[in-house]
Amino acid sequence: GSEMCIRDRIRDVQKLAVENSRLGIPLLFGMDVIHGYETIFPIPLGLSCTWDMAAIRESARIAAIEASADGISWTFSPMVDISRDPRWGRTLECYGEEPYLIAALGTEMVNGIQSQGVAATLKHYAVYSVPKGGRDGNCRTDPHVAPRELHELFLYPFKKVIQNSHPMGVMSSYNDWDGVPVSASYYFLTELLREEYGFDGYVVSDSEAVEFVESKHHVADTYDEAVRQVLEAG
């Protein structure tokens, strides 16, 4: 449907939540908003080719204004994964393969989005962009990413953007690292993200990441056990 339809639907549901629920707590509506909302800008890979930090920040600001007008206060953007495998189908959503450039662009995206009171969410934390066989949705990281490569390449953009622009959110990915699901990893979600990087926002799991702890990684016997592991990880 049209954006007007989306706006009307969000308004109706929000009104119901505020006026007809016991506590009257507003709902939080989120959307990807990767490269624009009503105004469509170039794909992230195209934006990165400009090296124009001011223009990239402005594109994020405009997208946030438009999304906010529809009642959306939460974006699943920016995506600061590093593209290292050309077979991977989400390369176009990345800013390329250079960690420093990705961190710089991610910082500007967060600044632009959050300047309008809309939450930015860094994704996908972490080591999401090298799935086995380059097949998106595959929960196994392949090839094995060594610790030095992990920290100097894949985690660098997350660390820098968090310290430079303080995004409100981080999305935990559904893949593993060294045999441990990232979304159930205390090392990734607490020791690195909060204690070392200083992140103080919320963590949201990627689609089915909690379920996959049981169904694909097989490190939990039940879904309830998977939920427990994820919550205790951070």
Annotate the PLM regions.
Residues 1-234:
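Glycoside hydrolase catalytic-domain context in secreted enzymes
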